[in-house]
Curated annotation (Swiss-Prot):
A cellular component term, taken from the record's GO annotations: chloroplast
Similarity comment text for this entry: Belongs to the intron maturase 2 family. MatK subfamily.
Pfam families registered for this protein in UniProt: Intron_maturas2 (PF01348), MatK_N (PF01824)
The UniProt record lists the keyword ATP-binding: no
Chief place where the protein resides: plastid
Single annotated GO MF: RNA binding
Database matches in InterPro entries: Domain_X, Maturase_MatK, Maturase_MatK_N
Protein name: Maturase K
C-alpha cells in the first residue's frame, strides 16, 4: 500500500481508473486475513482457526460472484455460527470487505490531503478538548448558534453517487454498489451511533462510509462559508439617491449558488465559525434572527440538492447565546454576559467605561452522571452509594484500579467545567461505593476496611490525580481555573449515555 501511495502521488489518475485491479493483489488480502484472525482468535475454537485456511483463488471467485449479484445476500448476510461452511464463507466475505476498505481509505486519504492543501485556515484537530478553547476565543463574538445534527439515514445510491464524483472505475463502482446494497442496514441511526461512539470490531467499513460522507458535505459547505469573507461588496449603478443607497448596501454582498436560481444575501460584517465532532455540528453566527433562519433554510436546501436528503427541521435548532443552553460533547454550553471595567487615563482626566463581553461557561451534567451511576449500580436513584456486587470476585487491587480509572477519566474530561467542585460529589459516591464493595467482599464493615493496613492504597488512589494536576496551579491560580487536556481523543463513555430532551 505504501508503494501504491507513492505511485499515486506521481500520477493521480490511478484513483479514478485503476482501483478494481487492486482487488486481485494477494498482499492486500494477506493483511486483511491476518487482521481477521487476530480479531477472532479470542472467540473461535482452535480447531476451527487451524482448519480455516485462506485461498486467494476463492477470493477471486467471490469477487466475480458479487459483481454478478447472485450470491451477495448469502455472502454478506448473517451466517449460522454453528456451521463451519458459513464460518469459512463469512471469513472470506470479511476479507473482501477489509480489502475494499483498505483500497478506499488509501484513495480517500490522498484525495482529502489534496483538498486540505487548498483550504487556507482549515484545521483538523484530533483532540476533543481543543474545540473548547476555539469556542472560548471565537464564539463570544457571535450572538446565535445553529445546533445541527447531520442526517445519517443514507441510501446506498447516494453513497454510490458520492464515490462516482472522484472514482471513474466502472467495475469498482459495480462491486461497491452490490456491497453497499447488502450493507444498507449498517447505515441505520443505531449502528452509526455505535460506530461513532465506540468503534467495534466490524465497524471499520461503516465508519469509513460515514467519514467520507461527512467529508463530502464539508467539502461543499466549508468553501461556501469561506466565501462569506472573500466576496466583494455588491456593485451598484447610478441612482438618484446614491448616497442613501450606498449607506444601505455597503455592508451587503451576494454570491451565486449553482444549486439554486436565486442569489443568497448575507451581511458582510457577520462572523461565521464552524465546529463539528461526530454527528453534531455548531455554526456560530453574528447577525439578526432573520439571517440565521435564512442560513437554516439554505442548509436544508443544500442537503436536498446535493445529497437528495430530506432533513427534518428539528435537526437544526437556533439558539440565542445569551438565553439558551446547548448540549455538545457531554457539556451544557452556556454563554454568560460579563462586564469589564476599563479605565483610560488621559492628560487631564480619567475615563471609565464598561466593556460587555460573552464568556463561555461549559457545565458538567452532574444529574445525568448520577443517573448513569445509578443505572450501573454504583448508587441508587437518590445518589446514595451502594456496593458493586459484580466486582466482589475480583482482587482488591483490581477493584481499586477500576474505581480509580472511572474517577480519573471523569475528572480529566470535565476539568474544564465551571462546576468542577460538584464533581467531588461524584468522587464521594465512587469512594463509598468502592468501600462498600470491599466490605461486602471481605464480609466486613466500611470502618474496618478503611482502618486496615492496606487501606493506604484506598486513601491515596482517589486523591493522587488531583494532587498531580493541581500541584502547579494551587498556589498561583484559583480552584475554578479551567484546564483542557489535549490528549483526550474520544468522548467520555458517560457523556455518550446521556439522553437529552430538548
Amino acid at each position: 500500500m505504501d508503494e501504491f501511495q507513492r505511485d499515486g502521488k506521481k500520477n493521480r489518475s490511478w484513483q479514478q481508473c485503476f482501483l478494481y485491479p487492486l482487488f486481485f493483489r494477494e498482499d492486500l488480502y494477506a493483511i486483511a486475513h491476518d487482521h481477521n484472525l487476530d480479531r477472532s482468535s479470542s472467540s473461535e475454537p482452535t480447531e476451527i482457526l487451524n482448519s480455516n485456511y485462506f485461498s486467494f483463488l476463492t477470493v477471486k471467485r467471490l469477487i466475480r460472484r458479487i459483481r454478478q449479484q447472485n450470491d451477495s445476500i448469502v455472502l454478506f448476510g448473517i451466517c449460522d455460527p454453528n456451521q463451519f461452511i458459513d464460518r469459512n464463507r463469512n471469513s472470506y466475505s470479511e476479507s473482501v470487505l477489509e480489502g475494499l476498505t483498505v483500497v478506499l481509505e488509501v484513495s480517500f486519504a490522498m484525495r482529502s490531503k489534496h483538498f486540505l492543501e487548498g483550504m487556507d485556515g482549515w484545521k483538523s484537530i484530533r483532540s476533543i478538548h481543543s474545540i473548547f478553547p476555539l469556542m472560548e476565543d471565537k464564539f463570544p463574538h457571535s450572538n446565535y448558534i445553529s445546533d445541527i445534527r447531520v442526517p445519517y439515514s443514507i441510501h446506498p445510491e447516494i453513497l454510490v453517487r458520492t464515490f462516482r464524483r472522484w472514482i471513474r472505475d466502472a467495475p469498482f463502482l459495480d462491486l461497491l454498489r452490490s456491497i453497499l446494497h447488502e450493507w444498507r442496514n449498517s447505515f441505520s441511526a443505531e449502528n452509526l451511533q455505535k460506530a461513532l461512539v465506540a468503534p467495534g470490531e466490524n465497524m471499520r467499513f461503516p465508519l469509513f462510509l460515514w467519514n467520507s460522507y461527512i467529508y463530502e458535505c464539508e467539502s461543499f459547505l466549508v468553501p461556501l462559508l469561506k466565501r462569506f469573507y472573500t466576496s466583494r461588496s455588491l456593485v451598484y449603478g447610478s441612482f438618484p439617491d446614491r448616497t442613501d443607497f450606498d449607506r444601505k448596501i455597503k455592508h451587503i454582498f451576494t454570491f451565486p449558488v449553482k444549486i439554486s436560481t436565486k442569489r443568497i444575501w448575507w451581511m458582510k460584517d457577520s462572523f461565521i465559525h464552524y465546529v463539528r465532532y461526530g454527528e453534531r455540528s455548531l455554526i456560530a453566527l453574528k447577525g439578526t434572527h432573520l439571517q440565521v433562519k435564512k442560513c437554516r433554510y439554505h442548509l436544508f436546501h443544500f442537503w436536498q440538492c446535493y445529497f437528495h436528503l430530506w432533513s427534518q427541521s428539528y435537526r437544526v435548532s437556533i439558539l440565542e447565546l445569551s438565553r439558551n443552553y446547548s448540549y455538545f460533547l457531554g457539556f451544557f454550553i452556556r454563554f454568560k454576559m460579563k462586564s469589564l471595567v476599563v479605565r483610560t487615563k488621559m492628560i487631564d482626566s480619567l475615563l471609565t467605561t464598561d466593556l460587555i463581553t460573552n464568556e463561555l461557561n461549559p457545565i458538567a451534567p452532574i444529574r445525568s452522571i448520577l443517573l448513569f451511576l445509578a443505572k450501573e449500580r454504583f448508587c441508587d436513584i437518590s445518589g446514595r452509594p451502594i456496593s458493586r456486587l459484580s466486582w466482589t470476585s475480583l482482587s482488591d487491587d483490581d477493584i481499586l484500579d477500576r474505581f480509580d480509572r472511572i474517577w480519573i477519566n471523569l475528572f480529566h474530561y470535565y476539568s474544564g467545567s465551571i462546576n468542577k467542585d460538584s464533581l467531588y460529589h461524584i468522587k464521594y459516591i465512587l469512594l463509598l461505593s468502592c468501600a462498600k464493595t470491599l466490605a461486602c467482599k471481605h464480609k466486613s464493615t466500611i470502618r474496618l476496611v478503611r482502618e486496615e493496613p492496606g487501606s493506604e492504597l484506598f486513601t491515596k488512589s482517589f486523591s493522587k490525580e488531583r494532587e498531580f494536576i493541581y500541584s502547579s496551579f494551587s498556589k498561583t491560580r484559583s480552584q475554578r481555573e479551567r484546564i483542557w487536556n489535549s490528549d483526550i481523543l474520544q468522548i467520555n463513555p458517560l457523556a455518550n449515555s446521556y439522553t437529552i430532551n430538548k
